[in-house]
Each structure stands twice: as structure tokens, then as C-alpha cells.
From Swiss-Prot:
Residues 148-207 form the SH3 domain. Residues 513-529, 1202-1212 have a biased composition (Pro residues). A motif (SH3-binding) lies at residues 1169-1175. This is SH3 and multiple ankyrin repeat domains protein 2. GO terms for cellular component: apical plasma membrane; asymmetric synapse; brush border membrane; ciliary membrane; dendritic spine; glutamatergic synapse; growth cone; hippocampal mossy fiber to CA3 synapse. Residues 783-795 have a biased composition (Gly residues). Glycans are attached at T1292. Residues 711-722, 847-868, 899-920, 1119-1130 have a biased composition (Basic and acidic residues). PROSITE patterns: PDZ, SAM_DOMAIN, SH3. Belongs to the SHANK family.
Length: 1474
């Protein structure tokens, strides 16, 4: 382009179009900026023309009325002026500096003349720009008046622009005259360029409206309705442009048929009086399409006809629905009066209106631009390898890599003509368009574009192809051009052609994406060097042209010679990039990224096999491969994808999974997804450190972004930690948190996901290491060298092992810790291979075994004690930042107030924790490091079993975390360590004590006291507390929270924290549910241990004991595998729901977190779970042990799974619990998740889990239906909460992962109830058996268990504690549901939890209609929606108004967040139904 421009601009500025456009565009902009340019031009003009200042001035004055454009166009130099003043010096109108520079650098030099500037200076910026332009362009260019619209002129003699504002004319060009200027110059548009030209060069031609009409009918609808908005019609130059014919037709149809047309138009309940019919848009309703041969068609109706009357009633201004109803009322007889508007489109007009489209010309182009920006951002971000490669390929490579293709293009362009060249050039510069165009064209033509690219001579074939492609395109354009249409028309056609080509290719790719991949995939592999491109190439096909375009472009860009090196590099860069994308699709994504071509070849073959859930990959890929996902990603979740695109690619990459996840979760758990969005937004702002740091965080989906951001942030921290000796082991763990799930998804898909979350970060840095292995290696780097190898190896079938290693990063710490604990050789349930002790599955299995043993052992008095000790959960709940009196609370505290910090810390802590976990992994492994893998927090799960956790949970946790002591010498463990892992706790650093406390609890099993050090407890704590309270009251809130009710955000950067926390929890805070456990323990110290145990069960693990019961109730069945998860009421749900939640909220990369979020019910871990959950968890604590073990593995898996949203290999693959949850989730959102889980879960287990999942779902429903059961429990509220929660959760989360989510929340509720109501003994008793039999217990069984538990709980010392706790929770359960408890509140009311608020506030004892305004305010506060109480009070909303509040009313009351509205509506419904 540059060369062409230079060539042309040296003498004339042939591309007047640019200036013309600029001028046109600048007209509005003609403000200071424009004037400045004008001034400069003016001075230039003056210099060149040497026009006297007076002349300039006069010109300026006279031109005041002229449009800046015209003024500009008016040459200010009289001397060589063709007419009037101006010599059209190429530079007089230097509107577009670039052109000016190109065109007349010399002139520019001469031009600048201060004097003239002075002349212009009188016209200050305020002065008319026109005036400026006038004196700038004195002379012929002065606009005297507007031309009569609609007249058509044809150029009779060619004209080359002499000045900037002029346009070139070629004989035969159709020229549309826009205005008449001085000096015999007219302003008009030709070939899409607008500018001045001598009037003598054109001759008027009589329009042949009919001619146009013929062309317009078909095009009319498109042109009119597709490309123009109503506004543009009005602004269309004039009615004269439109040929209007009206007709009245009578349509008579048969009963079984329609009229054969599709009506489209503005929606309005009442006629839109503001609508002013115009010739171009005479009515609001028009025929979008008419079925050929249909009744309407036969009557002469055509697409684009406007409905003026329906059955003799005027409908010009009537809204769509009303018109449709009027048509329906007529039955089979319809009288329509329609107006057919035929636009008299001259090529100029078309060009003018469509010129803009050229930029839009191809979605590809737009994408390209966007991609470019993304790439640029990525470059900035540091995806230097992947992003840079892609960027370079796209941006720079166009010249470097595309050189061959570019030359061909240039040649072709030149041959075709400057305009064609221009068009081509544009795509070329975009690179994307050309490539995509070519691809699309080739694809459509059945040409294997990729093959040349892929196969051996990337250069030749690729370039050749591109050339061919280009030629083809050109030829197409040429054909179009040569089809006998005038040059002008040709030009118009050309851009449209490109546009169509691109559009077609793009759309085709979208629709045909799946098929194309199969045919093309083989080709793309060859470009493996450009792994990004080639491998993607097929994928792109799959996804759409966008991808292919990218691939092609990159390929084209990549020079043949460079191909090997570049390919390798690109492959690395892009490979990394795409690897993530591809990983989504391909089990061998790793292979793809492998350095050796062989893997790529394998990948190709695999690539052919799309993941069962391409979209699960899409999210990842989309984020990762900024371009590829464009189509599928968009399809699945355009919002996310686009966000990613617009955001930096890195961001996208980083959140790829989350993105996808986000989408799904959004839909499924309306509340959560909403919140996720808000979270992402808030978090990003609030938690730049956590979320922001990872650019990927900005991923489209707030949730994904938040989670991804948190993960990325954490990964970055991990990276730093890794780099630092202190955190080496933890680092790995943390990294794995992000990557952990990928371990299971070690398969390319999974790992990519990892890459998306963790890897991406890594990718940024070590991304380049190798094309194929680099991404993994990066992960490995983060995980640890050994891990990398394992990952690579496991990339395929043994994803579990490899993944385990990978996940080790995140869960790795846990896993690693775990591995010593579970050195037993576990056999992969699915593959039958020996599992790596540190693999998530092995850890999960070992955790499960431990849990079983522990559950058999009984919970000891610990849990009960914890419960008794722990009113903490209340405190915690009440105030997230308050230490509720025990470490868990502290942790919550940390979370609440330090949410952001916590998030960051958590990540960091997670990292350190993970590292520590690595150090202690032997001890921790028992804890179900799997869960911890995902979330360091989970690590503590097994440890939880040990009642003798140690001193206070906090201490214990700290110690455990800090100290890698086995057992729970948590108190021994230095706080510093916990702090390090504190990140995990988020508040761990701030509140190491709390974390240790949790840890201790987590250390519930004596064996796993060491595990506690993982600091998993903190997350559980939050989770637990939340769960506990929310278990009873606000399981749903998590979704809502995600949905938008980020009450938790109040706690700390709630929105981000929520996500971050979620992520953290998932990763390191998975233990949040354990938080619940923590709070469960009545006594701080004793309780702590149980609590710790609960906590220890990271969100999922902790749950096993407690969750188990709860799960039984709410879906513990699921928890069977994830019984450990069940242990935490939330945790259990977490496990079940962890997948769901994870999917919903934290799908991105932190199962645990997600789990926690859901488990917490309301405020997921993310929001305030940490603080509030603890109190709630208290009761749960005692259960922690029994369920703990099972859950632990479960959660771990879940956590792992969640992080690897990539296509999960087999839904059942993951741990039972995880698999269960993940299955739904996997199918829905992440293939990886399942994969991740699968390593953890055995085949049978997976199946069982699936079964349990469904059962749990049903149970949840049943449970929610049986609040009575819950009520029967000593903690009736809990039970009730559980029940309501369960169903709500189901409903809320059901979208996301119906069962998982539902149960996720519900289990929390159930669990909390169970935990709180059941004595630890009971729990262990029940838990063990239940777990053993199947997490799924009949709802009756669950209720039985729960019911008995309450009595047991009451009887057992824990029970009193539970009762106490319950009393808090219980009030909290109802109130909590509404967010009365801080914990509850902090999680924005979980929709499902929104039961009656369990609160001591008066409103809880009164019927809704008797509530006073303060009661309503208290109720809102209980829903964690205290931010709205003022408006409710101001508007005097009392209980009698609540049932009648509609969405609009709520919006008027300031409840603009969907999640908040949902929470309110759900809570209201529960209140009214209670």
C-alpha cells in the first residue's frame, strides 16, 4: 500500500478516497483537530500557491458557510488552480497528514507558512472551521450550494486530482454531485471517493429509475435494510434517490399455510409518533423476506416492501407486534398496501454508502483489525511469543511474511488497477482479510488453501496459495469488474465482492466450520511451524474464516524461508497461542504444540476429531487464540469472545476457558453469571492485582475474566514465587491451580485450558520455549520441570498423570503433598494406568481412601467441638472482615475485608501454599491434594479429619500452611508460611491464623495434619462459612452473586474478589467450603481442627465429611465421589456444584473457587464466603471428617476439573464427584473439565457420579421441596434453607450445571444443615457409609440423615455447638439466606438460598405484607442488597409493596443488576411461598 500510495501520491493523490473520506469524516470533527490540519494545509497551500493573505482571508470568510470538507477542497492557491484559485497542489488540503506526507512531502515542506497561518489565526478554532478550510482552500473549492440530489452525472473526460480535496475521474465513471463550488468545481462522489472535480469533466445523464429498480429489488432489501439504518435513510441525499411505487394486494391463504413473508420492523407497544416516514423508509414495518412462490410472492410482494396499510388500517408508525396481530386477526384474508422503495443507486451512491462497508467489507477484516489490536495488546502484555507471532504474522508479517503473497498481491493489484489494488491492499495490510478472503474463497471453491501452507514447502505452497488466492480473488473481483459493469460499478462491486467473499467465507466458515476442519485439518498441520496458523487453519475452518484467515495470513506472512524457523517460532508463539485454542479441541493440543512436527501431525489427525464439546474449547481457544474462536466462540458466547477479541489477545487467552465458562455459567446460573460479569468488571477495577494483572482477565466474560484474571494473577505471582526459592514448591502448586485442572486435561484441551489460565501467563513468559511443548513447558516451568515432562507425556491419554502433574502446579502443591500421603499406587479408573501419586486422580483417590478411613474413624469430638466453639461463622458471617473468633473467621475476615488482597494473596498464597504444599505435599497429599491442586485451600481437607488440629485454626492453619509439618502441627507451622500460602487464603497473609485454623480443621484427619499447611483451609473456611449460613439460607446467592449481586464485593473488591476468591478458592481457596467447616467447629481451638478439617477440605474436600451429609441431602450423592466435597455443605455442593459453579462462576480455571462460590451458596467464595462462610461452617465442621476424605478427592478433582474447562475427556473420567459435576459442565462448557476430572475420577466412579449427579439433582429438588426435613433438623432453618436452596440452586445453577450447580448450592445448604445439625459422629457415621455406598442417597435417606443428624447434633456436644451455631446460622439460615448474616450478605443473596431470612430482625417473624419499611430494609440487608435499602426506604417500599414490584419498578428503585433483581425476586418468592 505504501509503495502504491507513494507512487501515486508523488504526483497526485490518487487515493483521494482516503482524503475524501477523511474530509467527510472530518466534517463533523472539524473542530480543533480539523482546523489544525486545515491550518497546516492552509499554510502549505499558501506556500505553494503563494496566495495573498487577503485572498486567503476572503476565501476563509466566504467559505465560512462551506463545509470544512469543501473548504479543504477549495484550493487556497490561486496559481495553478484549475478553476479559480487553486493550483491543486497535492498538498494544499493536507487533511490527511499521511497522504499529505506521502503525496507531497516536498510541498509540505514548502507549504508550511506561518503567515498564512496567521491569516487563518483570526479564525480561531472557535471560528468556523469552514472558514479555516476556506482560507485553507481558497478558490474553486468553495461550496456555494448543495447540488440537487438524485441527479446522475457521468464522467466524460478523465481527471486526475490536482489537490488534496479532489477526486480522480475516469471516463464513464458515474458521479454523484453533492454540491456546487466556486471555480467550476463540483463536489461529488465517484467510485466511493468524495471530493472536488471540474464540472466540465462530467455530463448529466438521465436516470433510468427502472433500470435501477431491476437491480434494486433483490439488492434493495439488503442495501436498504441490512446496511442502512433508518437514520441513514433520512439522511440519504433525497427522496429523489428513491423510486416509490405503492400497491395494494389482497392475500388469500389456506388454513395450513402462511402468507409467505416475514415481517420485520421496529418494536413498539404503541405507535411511534416520532417516526417520520421518508421516501427511503416510508414505514416501520417491512417485508424482510418473501417466500418465492408463496402467497405474498404471487401477489407481487417483494422483500423490502414497506407496509403502509394492513386490512385498510394505516400501520406506518405501528409497532411490530401490533401489525403482526392485525395480520393475524384477518385470518386467511389479508389486504396489504405496500410501498416498494427502489433506490436509485448510482455507483457513487453505492460507493458512498457502501464505502464504509469496505472497511466492514469482511468480517474478517474487522476481525483482523480487532485481532490486530488484540495482538498488539498481547504484544504489550507479553504474549510476545504467541501474540507477537500472531501479531507479527498478521501485522508485520504481512510485509515480511506475506512478502511473497504481498508481492503477488501487489502485482495483481497493480494489474487489476489502483482501485482493485487498493481494495486488495487493504485486506493485505490487514492481512487477515486477504488470508481469510482467500481461504474463504478457496474453501468455497474447494481449493485446499491450507494444504500448500501446511505441507512441506510452507513458502511455496503457502505463498503460492495466497497468491493464487489473491489472484482468484482478484479474478473474482476482476470478473465482477469485467462483468460488463462500468469501472465505477466494478469498483463498487469489488469492495462488495471482497465483502461478500469475506462475508461468505466468514459466515460459511461459521456454519461450515465444523465440516471444513475435517477436510482442511490435514493441511493446516503442515504449517505447524506456524502452529498457530496451520493447526489452527483447520480449526479456523472449524471456527470460521476468521481462523482460517488468521492461519492463512500468518502462513502467508510467514516467509517460506522463515517458515521452518518462523514456523517453529510461530508455532511456539502461535502454537502456544493456538495450542490453547487447539487444546480445547484436540486431545493432542500438546502434540500440536510439540516441537516436533510429528506431534503436530498427530495433532492434525486429532484436530480432525473435534472435541465433543468444541465450544468448551472454543472459550479457551477463543481467549487464547484470539482469532480462531471468533466464530465458534462467538457462537457459544459472543460476548465473551468479542470481549476477548477487543481485549488483548493475551487476556483472551488467559481467560479462554473462563470465557466459555462464563457464558455457560451465565446462562445456567443466571445470578452467578451476572455476577461474574459484574465481578469481572468490578474485580478488574477493584482487583487489578488479581484479575487485572492477567490481561486475560479482561476476557469477555466477567466471570471468566475474574477467574482467569485471578488465575493469571496468581500464576504470575506463582511465577514470581517459582522464581523465588522460597516458593518453588508452592509455586508449582499454585501454577497448577490454574493448570492443575489442565493436568487432567493434560490432554491438549485441558492443558491448553491450563494454558489459558495458568499457561497463558506462563505462555507469556515461557510460551516460546517450544512450539509444541512450550506451552506445556511453560506450565511445566511453572509447575516444575518434571511436571512439564509428565504433562507432555500425559498430553494424550494419560492426561491424568501428566495433568496431575500439571495440575500439581495448582493442585500440584496439594497433589504433590498428597502424593506422599497417597503414595499407594492408584490405577487410573479409566485408563488402568498407574497414577502418578501427585496426579489429581491419585490424590483424589488417596484423599478418598483417607476420607473413608477418617469417616470410619469417626469425626472424633473435633467437629462437634469446632461447632460449639464456633459461633464464629456467625461472626464471620456478620462481618467478613471480623475474625469470627477463630481462624476460619479470620480467614473470612481476610477474605471479606481483604478480599482483594485475599484474592491476590490468595493467589500468591495459593502459589506459595501450593509450593508449600509441594514441600508438604507428602503430608498433604492425603488431603486430597487433588482438590487442592485446584485450590490450594482444598489441601487441608484430609487433615481436617484430625480433631486435634492444633491450637486455633488460624494458628494451625498458619502453622500448617507455613509449616509443612505433616499432621496438623499447625500451631507449629510458622505463620509466615501460612502467609505465604496466605495468598491462598487471600487473608492468609493478613490472617495467617485463620488459615491455619482452617488448615487444622482441614487436618481433621490426623494423617493429614500436614496437609493443613496447604492452607487450603482458608478457602474452605470462607466457603464453609458461607455454606453454613448460606447452606441454610443462601446457596443460591453464589449464582446471584455471580449474576450481579456482588454483595460480597462490598466485602472486598467483592466483584473481583468474588471471582478472584472463587478462583482462589477453587485453586487455593477451594477450602473455602472448609471455611464452613471451620466455622462449624464450635470451639475455636477444637473446633478449629474440625473446622480446619472442613476447611481443609478445600471447598470440595472439606465438604466430604460435612458435605457428605449435606450432599446426601442436597446432592451429596454426587458428592459421593466428591463426598469430600460434600463434607462442606457448600463444599459438597461445591464438588457437585464445584463443577457447576466452577462452570458457572469460575469455570475459568479454578474449580475450587467456583465450588466455593457455589458451595457457599450466596457469596461464593468469591465474595464474602471466606468471612461469612466460616461461621456457617461451624456446624459443618464436625462433619468435615467423614465427608472430608471423600469430598477431598472429589473436590480436588472438581477443582481440577473446573480449571481445565477444556473439553473434559470423559465426563465420568474425573473423580466421581468431579466427574459428575463436570460431566454436565464438561458437555456444556468445558471438555477439559471432564478431562481433568477424568484423571481424578475412575470410570466407574465417573459413571456413578453421573448417576449421582442426576440423583442429586433430583434430590436437591426434592430437598428443596422438603424444607420440612430441614426444619426438622435442630437447625430447621438450615434444613429449610437447604431445601429451598437446593431447588433454587438447581434452578439458578441448573442452567449452568443443573445438577452440579443446584446441588452445589444445595449441598452447601444441606450440608450446613447437616453439619450444623448433625453431630460429627453422626456425620462420620453417615458420611462414611454414605460415601461408601454412593454419595447419592435417596432424598428420603438424605432427609433421614439430616433429620437424625439434627437430633444427633443436638445431642452431641457438637450439636449444642451446632445448635448455637445454628442459632446463628439458623437465624442466619433464614436471615442469611437473605444475607442477614454478614456472610450471607456478603454473598449476594443466593437466589436459591433466598429463603426467609434467618435473622433476628423483626421482619423474619412477620408476614411479608406486614413488613414495615425498616423491615424491608433489613430484609434487603439480609439479602446482601443493603446498597438498595436507602432507595427502598426513600420510596417508602413496605411489605405490602414487595409482592407487586415488577422488574421496571426494581430498576427504578436502583436495582439495576440482574443478579440483584433475581435475588430479590427469589427471596420474595420464597417469602411468599413459605
Amino acid at each position: 500500500m505504501k509503495s502504491l500510495l507513494n507512487a501515486f501520491t508523488k504526483k497526485e493523490v490518487p487515493f483521494r478516497e482516503a482524503p475524501a473520506y477523511s474530509n467527510r469524516r472530518r466534517r463533523p470533527p472539524n473542530t480543533l483537530a480539523a482546523p489544525r490540519v486545515l491550518l497546516r494545509s492552509n499554510s502549505d497551500n499558501n506556500l505553494n500557491a503563494g496566495a495573498p493573505e487577503w485572498a486567503v482571508c476572503s476565501a476563509a470568510t466566504s467559505h465560512r458557510s462551506l463545509s470544512p470538507q469543501l473548504l479543504q477542497q477549495t484550493p487556497s492557491k490561486p496559481d495553478g488552480a484549475t478553476k479559480s484559485l487553486g493550483s491543486y497542489a497535492p498538498g494544499p488540503r493536507s487533511r490527511s497528514p499521511s497522504l499529505n506526507r506521502l503525496g507531497g512531502a516536498g510541498e509540505d515542506g514548502k507549504r508550511p507558512q506561518p503567515p498564512h497561518w496567521h491569516v487563518g489565526s483570526p479564525f480561531t478554532p472557535g471560528a468556523n472551521k469552514d472558514s479555516l478550510s476556506t482560507f485553507e482552500y481558497p478558490g474553486p473549492r468553495r461550496k456555494l450550494y448543495s447540488a440537487v440530489p438524485g441527479r446522475l452525472f457521468v464522467a466524460i473526460k478523465p481527471y486526475q486530482p490536482q489537490v488534496d480535496g479532489e477526486i480522480p475521474l475516469h471516463r464513464g465513471d458515474r458521479v454523484k454531485v453533492l454540491s456546487i463550488g466556486e471555480g467550476g468545481f463540483w463536489e461529488g462522489s465517484a467510485r466511493g471517493h468524495i471530493g472536488w472535480f471540474p464540472a466540465e469533466c462530467v455530463e448529466e445523464v438521465q436516470c433510468k429509475p427502472r433500470d435501477s429498480q431491476a437491480e434494486t429489488r433483490a439488492d434493495r432489501s439488503k442495501k436498504l435494510f441490512r446496511h442502512y439504518t433508518v437514520g441513514s435513510y433520512d439522511s440519504f441525499d433525497a427522496a429523489s434517490d428513491c423510486i416509490i411505487e405503492d400497491k395494494t394486494v389482497v392475500l388469500q391463504k389456506k388454513d395450513n399455510e402462511g402468507f409467505g413473508f416475514v415481517l420485520r420492523g421496529a418494536k413498539a407497544d404503541t405507535p411511534i409518533e416520532e417516526f417520520t416516514p421518508t421516501p427511503a423508509f416510508p414505514a416501520l414495518q417491512y417485508l424482510e423476506s418473501v417466500d418465492e412462490g408463496g402467497v405474498a410472492w404471487q401477489a407481487g410482494l417483494r422483500t423490502g416492501d414497506f407496509l403502509i396499510e394492513v386490512n385498510n388500517e394505516n400501520v406506518v408508525k405501528v409497532g411490530h407486534r401490533q401489525v403482526v396481530n392485525m395480520i393475524r386477526q384477518g385470518g386467511n384474508h389479508l389486504v396489504l398496501k405496500v410501498v416498494t422503495v427502489t433506490r436509485n443507486l448510482d455507483p457513487d451512491d453505492t460507493a458512498r454508502k457502501k464505502a464504509p462497508p469496505p472497511p466492514k467489507r469482511a468480517p474478517t477484516t474487522a476481525l483482523t483489525l480487532r485481532s490486530k489490536s488484540m495482538t498488539a495488546e498481547l504484544e504489550e502484555l507479553g504474549l510476545s511469543l504467541v501474540d507477537k507471532a500472531s501479531v507479527r504474522k498478521k501485522k508485520d508479517k504481512p510485509e515480511e511474511i506475506v512478502p511473497a503473497s504481498k508481492p503477488s498481491r501487489t502485482a495483481e493489484n497493480v494489474a487489476i488497477e489502483s482501485r482493485v489494488a487498493t481494495i486488495k491492499q487493504r485486506p493485505t495490510s490487514r492481512c487477515f482479510p486477504a488470508a481469510s478472503d482467500v481461504n474463504s474463497v478457496y474453501e468455497r471453491q474447494g481449493i485446499a488453501v491450507m494444504t500448500p501452507t501446511v505441507p512441506g514447502s510452507p513458502k511455496g505452497p503457502f505463498l503460492g496459495l495466497p497468491r493464487g488466492t489473491m489472484r482468484r480473488q482478484k479474478s473474482i473481483d476482476s470478473r465482477i469488474f469485467l462483468s460488463g459493469i462500468t469501472e465505477e460499478e466494478r469498483q463498487f462491486l469489488a469492495p462488495p465482492m471482497l465483502k461478500f467473499t469475506r462475508s461468505l467465507s466468514m459466515p460459511d466458515t461459521s456454519e461450515d466450520i465444523p465440516p471444513p476442519p475435517q477436510s482442511v485439518p490435514p493441511s493446516p498441520p503442515p504449517p505447524s511451524p506456524t502452529t498457530y496458523n496451520c493447526p489452527r487453519s483447520p480449526t479456523p475452518r472449524v471456527y470460521g474464516t476468521i481462523k482460517p484467515a488468521f492461519n492463512q495470513n500468518p502462513v502467508a506472512k510467514v516467509p517460506p524461508a522463515t517458515r521452518s524457523d518462523t514456523v517453529a517460532t510461530m508455532m511456539r508463539e502461535k502454537g502456544m497461542f493456538y495450542r490453547r485454542e487447539l487444546d480445547r479441541f484436540s486431545l493432542d493440543s500438546e502434540d500440536v504444540y510439540s516441537r516436533s512436527p510429528a506431534p503436530q501431525a498427530a495433532f492434525r489427525t486429532k484436530r480432525g476429531q473435534m472435541p465433543e464439546n468444541p465450544y468448551s474449547e472454543v472459550g479457551k481457544i477463543a481467549s487464547k487464540a484470539v482469532y480462531v474462536p471468533a466464530k465458534p466462540a462467538r457462537r457459544k458466547g459472543m460476548l465473551v469472545k468479542q470481549s476477548n477479541v477487543e481485549d488483548s489477545p493475551e487476556k483472551t487467552c488467559s481467560i479462554p476457558i473462563p470465557t466459555i465458562i462464563v457464558k455457560e455459567p451465565s446462562t445456567s446460573s443466571s445470578g452467578k453469571s451476572s455476577q461474574g460479569s459484574s465481578m469481572e468488571i468490578d474485580p478488574q477495577a477493584t482487583e487489578p492485582g488479581q484479575l487485572r494483572p492477567d490481561d486475560s482477565l479482561t476476557v469477555s466474560s466477567p466471570f471468566a475474566a475474574a477467574i482467569a484474571g485471578a488465575v493469571r494473577d496468581r500464576e504470575k505471582r506463582l511465577e514470581a514465587r517459582r522464581n523465588s526459592p522460597a516458593f518453588l514448591s508452592t509455586d508449582l502448586g499454585d501454577e497448577d491451580v490454574g493448570l492443575g485442572p489442565p493436568a487432567p486435561r493434560m490432554q491438549p484441551s485441558k492443558f491448553p485450558e491450563e494454558g489459558g489460565f495458568g499457561d497463558e501467563d506462563e505462555t507469556e513468559q515461557p510460551l516460546l520455549p517450544t512450539p509444541g511443548a512450550a506451552p506445556r513447558e511453560l506450565e511445566n516451568h511453572f509447575l516444575g520441570g518434571g511436571e512439564a515432562g509428565a504433562q507432555g507425556e500425559a498430553g494424550g491419554p494419560l492426561s491424568s498423570t501428566s495433568k496431575a502433574k500439571g495440575p500439581e502446579s495448582g493442585p500440584a502443591a496439594a497433589l504433590k503433598s498428597s502424593s506422599p500421603a497417597s503414595p499407594e499406587n492408584y490405577v487410573h479408573p479409566l485408563t488402568g494406568r498407574l497414577l502418578d501419586p501427585s496426579s489429581p486422580l491419585a490424590l483424589a483417590l488417596s484423599a478418598r481412601d483417607r476420607a473413608m478411613q477418617e469417616s470410619q474413624q469417626g469425626h472424633k469430638g473435633e467437629a462437634p467441638k469446632a461447632d460449639l466453639n464456633k459461633p464464629l461463622y456467625i461472626d464471620t458471617k456478620m462481618r467478613p472482615s471480623v475474625e469470627s473468633g477463630f481462624p476460619p473467621v479470620t480467614r473470612q475476615n481476610t477474605r471479606g475485608p481483604l478480599r482483594r488482597q485475599e484474592t491476590e494473596n490468595k493467589y500468591e498464597t495459593d502459589l506459595s501454599k501450593d509450593r508449600r504444599a509441594d514441600d508438604k505435599k507428602n503430608m498433604l497429599i492425603n488431603i486430597v491434594d487433588t482438590a487442592q491442586q485446584k485450590s490450594a485451600g482444598l489441601l487441608m481437607v484430609h487433615t481436617v479429619d484430625i480433631p486435634v488440629a492444633g491450637p486455633p485454626l488460624e494458628e494451625e492453619e498458619d502453622r500448617e500452611d507455613g509449616d509443612t509439618k505433616p499432621d496438623h502441627s499447625p500451631s507449629t507451622v510458622p505463620e509466615g508460611v501460612p502467609k505465604t500460602e496466605g495468598a491462598l487464603q487471600i487473608s492468609a497473609a493478613p490472617e495467617p491464623a485463620a488459615a491455619p485454623g482452617r488448615t487444622i480443621v482441614a487436618a481433621g484427619s490426623v494423617e493429614e495434619a500436614v496437609i493443613l499447611p496447604f492452607r487450603i483451609p482458608p478457602p474452605p473456611l470462607a466457603s464453609v462459612d458461607l455454606d453454613e449460613d448460606f447452606l441454610f439460607t443462601e446457596p443460591l446467592p453464589p449464582p446471584l452473586e455471580f449474576a450481579n449481586s456482588f454483595d460480597i464485593p462490598d466485602d472486598r473488591a467483592a466483584s473481583v474478589p468474588a471471582l478472584a476468591d472463587l478462583v482462589k478458592q477453587k485453586k487455593s481457596d477451594t477450602p473455602q467450603p472448609p471455611s464452613l467447616n471451620s466455622s462449624q467447629p464450635a470451639n475455636s481451638t477444637d473446633s478449629k481442627k474440625p473446622a480446619g478439617i472442613s476447611n481443609c477440605l478445600p471447598s470440595s474436600f472439606l465438604p466430604p465429611p460435612e458435605s457428605f451429609d449435606a450432599v446426601t441431602d442436597s446432592g451429596i450423592e454426587e458428592v459421593d465421589s466428591r463426598s469430600s466435597s460434600d463434607h462442606h455443605l457448600e463444599t459438597t455442593s461445591t464438588i457437585s456444584t464445584v463443577s457447576s459453579i466452577s462452570t458457572l462462576s469460575s469455570e475459568g480455571g479454578e474449580s475450587m473457587d467456583t465450588c466455593t462460590v457455589y458451595a457457599d451458596g450466596q457469596a461464593f467464595v468469591v465474595d464474602k464466603p471466606p468471612v461469612p462462610p466460616k461461621p456457617k461452617m461451624k456446624p459443618i465442621v464436625h462433619k468435615s471428617n467423614a465427608l472430608y476424605q471423600d469430598t477431598l478427592p472429589e473436590e480436588d478433582t472438581d477443582g481440577f476439573v473446573i480449571p481445565p474447562p477444556a473439553p473434559p475427556p470423559p465426563p465420568g473420567s474425573a473423580q466421581a464427584g468431579v466427574a459428575k459435576v463436570i460431566q454436565p459442565r464438561t458437555s456444556k462448557l468445558w471438555g477439559d473439565v471432564t478431562e481433568v476430572k477424568s484423571p481424578i475420577l475412575s470410570g466407574p466412579k465417573a459413571n456413578v457420579i453421573s448417576e449421582l449427579n442426576s440423583i442429586l439433582q433430583q434430590m436437591n429438588r426434592g430437598k428443596s421441596v422438603k424444607p420440612g426435613e430441614g426444619l426438622e433438623l435442630p437447625v430447621g432453618a438450615k434444613s429449610a434453607n437447604l431445601a429451598p436452596r437446593s431447588p433454587e440452586v438447581m434452578s439458578t445453577v441448573s442452567g449452568t450445571r443443573s445438577t452440579t450447580v443446584t446441588f452445589t448450592v444445595r449441598p452447601g445448604t444441606s450440608q450446613p444443615i447437616t453439619l450444623q445439625s448433625r453431630p460429627p459422629d453422626y456425620e462420620s457415621r453417615t458420611s462414611g457409609p454414605r460415601r461408601a455406598p454412593s454419595p447419592v442417597v435417596s432424598p428420603t435417606e438424605l432427609s433421614k440423615e439430616i433429620l437424625p443428624t439434627p437430633p444427633s447434633a443436638a445431642a452431641a456436644s457438637p450439636s449444642p455447638t451446632l445448635s448455637d451455631v445454628f442459632s446463628l446460622p439458623s437465624q442466619s439460615p433464614a436471615g442469611d439466606l437473605f444475607g442477614l448474616n454478614p456472610a450471607g450478605r456478603s454473598r449476594s443473596p443466593s437466589p436459591s438460598i433466598l429463603q426467609q431470612p434467618i435473622s433476628n430482625k423483626p421482619f423474619t417473624t412477620k408476614p411479608v405484607h406486614l413488613w414495615t419499611k425498616p423491615d424491608v430494609a433489613d430484609w434487603l440487608e439480609s439479602l446482601n442488597l443493603g446498597e438498595h435499602k436507602e432507595t427502598f426506604m426513600d420510596n417508602e417500599i413496605d411489605g405490602s409493596h414487595l409482592p407487586n414490584l415488577q422488574k421496571e419498578d426494581l430498576i427504578d428503585l436502583g436495582v439495576t443488576r440482574v443478579g440483584h433483581r433475581m435475588n430479590i425476586e427469589r427471596a420474595l418468592k420464597q417469602l411468599l411461598d413459605r
